[in-house]
Amino acid sequence: MLRHKTFQNKIAVSRFSLPVTATLIAMIWVAVGLVQGDIWTELAFALASTLLMVELNNRNALMRTYSRMVSCSFLTLLSVTSLPEPSLHANVVTLCFIAFTLLIWNGYQDRQSTGRTFYAFACLGIASMEFVQILYYLPILWAMMMFFTNSFSLRNFASSILGVIIPYWFAAGFFVYTNNIDYLIAHFASFIDFHTLFDYSMITVHQLVNLSFITLLAVIGAVHFLHTSYADKIRTRMIYESFIMLDIVSFLFLVLQPQHEYELEGIMIVCTAPLFAHFITFTKGKLCNITFITILVMAVLLLLYNLLFSPVMLL
């Protein structure tokens, strides 16, 4: 007997899912931009990030069947949690982190992939110019190269160091030329500023609700994947397990330094979108369909909450 496809299953494999989602999201961004102000640069970064997520999905076969849920989930999560005042800094960090992920997994099991490693970590170096605290991820990412991409070697390690440094090599020349080297010193000084640990005084209720929504989807996606990972190829399992690890690390960093919520939330969205997309694509049954519809409704309500209600400080 053929199983009747639920609403969730139809959406998951539809070729119209991404075009429809992108059109609706773009209309929302344009409407918000006309009312709120100039957010067109942020919109361009959001669309570019979505295209990179499409490429990440295609290059690594994140879904073992045709599905555009990775990019749909990413674009929806990014828009719902960032509007009406998206952060340009966070969008730059998000774009660079996706580019890093795409490049580093292109060197899977290749301990001679010095070029890919260099460019991957150069993306991380560019991101650190906007958000220097992302350099705290370096030990985690080297561990990821050891245990997940299986591409760690002394040559690749040296390439990663050079990749992180190279953006600052060019920036330092500019700052010396403009006699503004103090800005670069202050930039690195903020890297070791621990006076703001556990400072939740700048966090709003909106930010807490957004983080709770992303965390909920991350937990749902992670639990589902760990339960069904046997059906995926080893490389795919490694990718998803690295996403779970980075989600956990990002959440812990966010607890430690909540003032960086926008940038860390962007990294969490990159890691959470494939996990939840896997849940949407490969779960069946009435309960899962109800869960999917409930989360869609929650996303709409969260968007309306962020757009219509002014932020209120948590403390």
Positions of predicted regions on the chain:
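Juxtamembrane membrane-water interface segments that cap and precede transmembrane helices
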Residues: 23-30, 185-208, 221-225
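Aromatic- and kink-enriched transmembrane "portal" helix at the membrane-lumen/periplasm boundary
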Residues: 34-35, 73-91
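Transmembrane-helix signature of polytopic, membrane-embedded enzymes
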Residues: 59-77
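Membrane-interface transmembrane helices that cradle and orient dolichyl/undecaprenyl
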Residues: 100-115
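Membrane-interface alpha helices of multi-pass inner-membrane proteins
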Residues: 117-130
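Perimembrane helix-loop-helix junctions
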Residues: 137-162
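Membrane-interface helix-loop-helix junctions at transmembrane boundaries of multi-pass membrane enzymes
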Residues: 222-246
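Hydrophobic/aromatic-rich transmembrane helices and adjacent perimembrane loops
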Residues: 261-278
